[in-house]
């Protein structure tokens, strides 16, 4: 990938703004509003992509997102689409109302508009595709408009058993791969959408068709799926949640007196696999026969007898819901914990007690596992969370989110890294935060790329006025919106714990000794930084070791908890359950599993971050003053621009007698304005009109109250 300061930001449209100074571009472009970026000039090659839809591939007018990939000639564009390694050039564009047998033209312009125009990575403009030979292919992700129960309306892609990939998901329209020579002169590449990515041929008998997959039971693994009433109500359509259940050796469904603890293994889309990649992983044979082979002269020993559960909860925003109640994704926490788990406990021989329900997982699953114990200590006994996503937004990966002004740049102008490796002990940055976010934009706008940074916007943030996630920064420039970041605090798990330490939730005592967290100091995604913040702040509140935190030197992202071998890990968890059961050495007290400690209530989540909350955040402009005007000067009107979503750019206009006075002028959110009439006016009304603009939002002009000028 190109370096942040010498790669795609050296696009001539950016360099022209700053006399070709690439480092200055990197710093200053990150601070510029979109309108300023739009002033850059295009090169003149004039490359366009013309896409047509073959007959019978669309049933009606369709909205969606088109991604076109230019791969090296002879290479399948889908072979490598990863931001750290792909040789491809990616270009994306939203499309609206595409008719059956319709056409789409992708061409870059001098205006950068990710909502209606083309956005590319690692070069922004189609005009900057270097001359050469390419294999080109296009993909059309179709959106459906949905009206949610909180009054919001959005257009998204609903996955169907494919884990919500960022491109070429089930039902996508695709073109054939076309080998093209790009000349550098004006040129049009013609592609035809004449194929559909087929849904997997599922053979199971679960309800809901392909939603959340549909798999056949085996002797040792059972598949369940339910229609969630809570999710279906929120989304206004049938929504499902499923589980892959691995049974222990000797399990007998008819023996209801022998009951088993349950491990809820959180993570990404599992498809038909169980936890720990069962049944293909090496431990599977021993799990099935119930015996762990002895090593180095040690005797064989029995496998720990537990039920292992992997969850299937793909969403319109990602391959996984983060297993929590959120304003953007809906009540997935309730769907899993209040609907699916009771169904599992009704149909399998489980021990339905908190001490016997354990959460574990890594990365995304690491965050989910600890969040579920923090939010539901009444339901689960403990978590074993490995390299979890950001536990504390003082370090969101490597971004000081609460204090920095830009998500892409440090105060000294250097790029903030996102993905790294180590070679001979030296850190090697594989992608910056800017690069990864700009790459995501080619797959979807308004946090719809189905990729990592976008889903964090969906899970941690609230709804914007447009119904989509209120993004914490400008996706193009990286400018952080502090007001938007403040809405993330309710999902900052460290902040949630210390804020509710000794109030009615009493989390300081409720959670003591129940959170086990592991990360390596060389984590690929800098997740060790959030874990360190979590440890520092909880130790400050509860004393050293309040939570069981392990940070192993020089360990990267991945592996089992504390880098343990699989059986060592499973026996550790099993022993915790035995120790904390009613006959164990340290039974889990009933006063730490009380319902009053339950958090992440969906009604409160919507009240805080749903559509009605977004509406309440808004306010029109207002004016005061002018009580003693004579109409010929000598009085001053005070104006407020009103309240708008973070990131909305404002332009104000004073209006007298229904006619603009002077030129419109840019204003900042929260700015106080004043106006002194300079001409005599007979009984004219004075108003303040403010127009707000933000990518992904409808341009809107709001008008203040009117005050009469009197002579």
Residue ranges of model-derived segments:
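A short, amphipathic beta-strand motif
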Residues: 47-55
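Short beta-strand elements bearing conserved aromatic residues within extracellular beta-rich modules
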Residues: 66, 243, 650-653
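Fungal secretory targeting signals
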Residues: 1-2, 7, 11-40
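Surface-exposed coil/turn segments at beta-strand junctions on protein surfaces, enriched
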Residues: 42, 129-131, 184, 236, ...
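Ser/Thr/Pro/Gly-rich low-complexity disordered regions
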Residues: 606-711
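Low-complexity, serine/threonine/proline/glycine-rich extracellular segments that form mucin-like
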Residues: 59-73
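Short proline/glycine-enriched turn/loop motifs at strand-loop junctions of beta-rich domains
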Residues: 62-63, 219, 239-240, 644-649
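Non-catalytic cap/lid and distal C-terminal segments of serine-dependent acyl enzymes
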Residues: 72-75, 79-609
């Amino acid at each position: 990938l190109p370096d942040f300061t010498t790669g795609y930001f050296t696009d001539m449209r950016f360099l022209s703004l700053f006399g070709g100074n690439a480092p200055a571009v990197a710093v200053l472009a990150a601070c510029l509003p979109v309108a300023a970026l739009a002033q850059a000039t295009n090169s003149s090659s004039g490359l366009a992509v013309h896409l047509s839809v073959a007959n019978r591939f669309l049933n009606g007018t369709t909205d969606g997102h088109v991604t076109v990939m230019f791969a090296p000639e002879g290479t399948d564009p889908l072979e490598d689409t990863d931001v750290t390694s792909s040789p491809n050039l990616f270009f994306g564009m939203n499309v609206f109302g595409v008719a059956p047998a319709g056409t789409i033209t992708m061409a870059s312009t001098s205006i950068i508009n990710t909502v209606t125009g083309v956005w590319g990575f690692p070069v922004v403009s189609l005009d900057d595709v270097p001359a050469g030979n390419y294999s080109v292919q296009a993909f059309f992700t179709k959106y459906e408009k949905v009206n949610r129960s909180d009054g919001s309306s959005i257009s998204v892609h609903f996955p169907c058993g494919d884990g919500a990939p960022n491109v070429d998901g089930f039902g996508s329209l695709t073109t054939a791969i076309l080998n093209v020579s790009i000349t550098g002169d004006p040129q049009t590449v013609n592609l035809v959408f004449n194929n559909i990515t087929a849904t997997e041929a599922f053979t199971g008998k679960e309800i809901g068709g392909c939603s959340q997959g549909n798999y056949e039971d085996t002797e040792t693994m059972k598949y369940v799926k339910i229609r969630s009433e809570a999710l279906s109500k929120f989304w206004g359509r049938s929504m499902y949640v499923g589980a892959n259940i691995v049974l222990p050796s000797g399990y007998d469904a008819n023996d209801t007196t022998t009951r088993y603890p349950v491990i809820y293994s959180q993570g990404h889309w599992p498809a038909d696999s169980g936890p720990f990649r069962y049944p293909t992983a090496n431990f599977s044979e021993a799990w099935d026969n119930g015996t762990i082979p002895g090593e180095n002269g040690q005797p064989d020993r029995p496998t720990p007898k537990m039920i292992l559960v992997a969850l299937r909860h793909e969403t319109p925003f990602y391959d996984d819901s983060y297993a929590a109640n959120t304003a953007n994704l809906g009540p997935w926490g309730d769907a899993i914990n209040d609907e699916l788990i009771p169904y599992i406990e009704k149909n399998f021989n489980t021990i339905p007690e908190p001490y016997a329900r354990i959460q574990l997982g890594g990365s995304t699953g690491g965050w989910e596992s600890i969040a579920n114990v923090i939010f539901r200590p009444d339901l689960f006994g403990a978590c074993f969370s490995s390299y979890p996503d950001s536990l504390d937004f003082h370090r969101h990966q490597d971004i000081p989110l609460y204090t920095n002004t830009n998500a892409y740049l440090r105060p000294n102008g250097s790029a903030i890294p996102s993905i790294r490796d180590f070679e001979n002990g030296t850190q090697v940055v594989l992608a910056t935060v800017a690069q990864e976010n700009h790459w995501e934009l080619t797959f979807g706008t308004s946090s719809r790329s189905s990729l990592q940074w976008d889903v964090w916007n969906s899970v941690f943030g609230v709804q914007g006025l447009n119904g989509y996630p209120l993004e914490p920064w400008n996706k193009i420039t990286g400018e952080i919106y502090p007001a938007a970041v403040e809405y993330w605090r309710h999902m900052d798990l460290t902040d949630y714990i210390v804020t509710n330490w000794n109030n009615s939730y009493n989390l300081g005592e409720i959670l003591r000794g129940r959170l086990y967290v592991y990360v390596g100091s060389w984590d690929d995604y800098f997740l060790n930084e959030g874990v360190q913040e979590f440890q520092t702040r909880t130790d400050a509140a509860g004393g050293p070791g309040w939570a069981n935190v392990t940070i192993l030197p020089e360990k990267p992202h991945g592996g089992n908890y504390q880098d343990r071998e699989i059986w060592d890990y499973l026996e550790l968890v099993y022993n915790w359950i035995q120790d904390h059961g009613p006959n164990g050495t340290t039974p889990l007290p009933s006063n730490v599993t009380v319902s009053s400690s339950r958090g992440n209530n969906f009604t409160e989540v919507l009240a805080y971050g749903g559509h009605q909350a977004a509406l309440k955040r808004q306010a029109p402009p207002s004016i005061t003053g002018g009580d003693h005007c004579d109409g010929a000067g000598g009085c001053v009107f005070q104006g407020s621009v009103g309240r708008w979503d973070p990131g909305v750019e404002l332009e104000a206009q004073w209006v007298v007698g229904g006619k603009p006075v002077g030129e419109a002028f840019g204003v900042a959110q929260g700015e106080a304005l004043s106006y002194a009439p300079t001409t005599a006016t007979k009984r004219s009304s004075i108003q303040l009109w403010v127009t707000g603009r933000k990518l992904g939002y409808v341009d809107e002009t709001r008008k203040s109250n009117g005050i009469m000028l009197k002579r």
